[in-house]
Amino acid sequence: MTTPPLPYLDPSHLTAALRDTGYALLRPDDVALLAGCSLPDLATLVPSWDRLELDDYLKDGGRYRRRRHSCFIDDGASLVQTPHRAHWQPVEYNALHGGMHRLFAPMETATVANPAWERLLRALGAACSAVTPAQPWFVEAHQFRIDTADGIGRPTPEGAHRDGVNFVAVIMIGRHGIKGGETRVFDADGPSGQRFTMTEPWTLLLLDDAAVIHESTPIQPLGEHGYRDTLVLTWRAGSFQGENV
């Protein structure tokens, strides 16, 4: 069976696509170009995914997710990491894990200090501002590893969802020894949408969170030690979610 080509977008159409369809998918080379660095520069961030901490908050009883989480404020001139804080979502956006403060391990200092990290986040923040000029942005960064040690790993155990922010980026970091993990993006108010499987490291999906819902299907092992690594970034105007809860 022939795999259909991914719906990649020319980066010059990024702003228009987010306004018109609510999402945009960029090739790895274009992500590096947007960030003003090389793919080898971005690759220097990848080893930190081998040092994520177990997510103890999964309500489905699973132990298939490892993660780190940190927060930043992007005012257009600088990107500043905030003191470490818990991640919070309302139950309206996360029926499984909403309504609870989840304090995850912070991102490693060396990862945040890597010049490629700031370049990537500031470039994507500028892309968000081109659609919605709402700086400062309150940015949350989530490093994820979903593994198949227990047979099945669920990238989005909460199902198809929105995140309650302005924009969401899902970046493929790597896949090893798995099948599945299909990404699905649908109109928030209708049945139309896209489904595709991101396989190349640094493929980027950028979403207008108010316009679309998204999910990734479970992964299954093709051998031992299967996993799927992603970086999820969110941008929200006004404040972090849960700041006054």
Where does each model-flagged region fall?
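Structured loops at beta-to-helix junctions and adjacent beta-edge loops in soluble globular domains
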Residues: D29, D74-G76, H142-F144, M172, ...
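Signature of the catalytic double-stranded beta-helix
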Residues: D74-E140
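Conserved hydrophobic/aromatic beta-strand scaffold that supports enzyme active sites
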Residues: L25, Q143, V168-V170, L204-L206, ...
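N-terminal auxiliary "cap/dimerization" subdomain that precedes the catalytic jelly-roll/cupin core
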Residues: M1-V91
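Catalytic core of Fe(II)/2-oxoglutarate
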Residues: E182-V245
